[in-house]
From Swiss-Prot:
Name of this chain's protein: Casparian strip membrane protein 1
Origin: domain of life: Eukaryota
Pfam family, one: CASP_dom
Membrane-crossing segments per the record: 68-88, 116-136, 158-178, 206-226
Cytoplasmic topological domain residue ranges: 1-67, 137-157, 227-229
Organism: Sorghum bicolor
Length: 229
């Protein structure tokens, strides 16, 4: 080995060995700081992100449709009461009139008149339909764009309105005959004797016609809503 090679070998000293000899820990390499542009991107994104706010139930886009659907729901509840009351009043309108003794009696029964029997059944069907249609009406309140349900309810409303109109008209004729009689046929009025029967059937006819009016308004309302959509 020459003198120059020995000098070169002597000058190579590891840094770790020197730091260990002096009692110092080796330097830890640190990552360079991120660029200013990269650090500013998340801050800008957080400042420009839109704030989440709750969407109101009656939005501006479909506020009118929701109001019409809500009115439809309320009217169905309103029509249910008169229809059910008419069916109950007719079904409980039987009356017995005793003359002289309890063995000689006259009866006034609603099922003796086919028109009144049809009237009671029609009102019971209408009341049941109005209850069953409430969930569908509630779905339309939540989803005004459900045109198929609107068409279905419109057709069913028209059928029930026609059925209830026929039943109420037939019952009204019988009630008028019970109040006034018919002189040409020698049919005497019976309401002078059977007060309870006539009062119940008369009230039932009035309630049924109220339900018919509400159903007709429902048909007009549904047609207007479908045409608007």
């Amino acid at each position: 080995m020459s003198t120059s090679e020995a000098g070169a070998a002597a000058t190579v000293i590891p840094i770790d060995d020197v730091a260990r000899d002096h009692g110092k820990a080796p330097a830890v390499a640190t990552a360079p700081p991120p660029p200013a542009a990269a650090a500013a991107v998340p801050a800008a994104a957080t400042t420009t992100a839109p704030r989440k706010t709750g969407v109101p139930f009656f939005r501006r886009a479909d506020r009118g449709s929701r109001c019409v659907a809500l009115l439809d729901f309320v009217l169905r509840v309103a029509a249910f009461g008169p229809a059910l009351a008419a069916a109950i009043a007719t079904g409980t309108s039987d009356e017995t009139l005793s003359v002289f003794t309890q063995f000689f009696q006259f009866h006034a029964r609603f099922d003796d008149f086919p028109a009144l029997l049809f009237f009671m059944v029609a009102n019971a069907i209408a009341a049941g339909y109005l209850v069953l249609s409430l969930p569908f009406s509630a779905v339309i309140v939540l989803r005004p764009q459900a045109i198929g349900l609107r068409h279905l309810l419109l057709v069913c409303d028209m059928i029930i309105a026609a059925l209830l109109t026929a039943a109420a008209a037939a019952a009204a004729a019988i009630v008028d005959l019970a109040h006034s009689g018919n002189l040409r046929a020698n049919w005497v009025p019976i309401c002078m004797q059977f007060h309870g029967f006539c009062q119940r059937t008369s009230g039932a006819v009035v309630g049924s016609f109220l339900a018919v009016l509400v159903l007709l308004f429902l048909v007009i309302l549904a047609a207007f809503a479908i045409r608007k959509r």
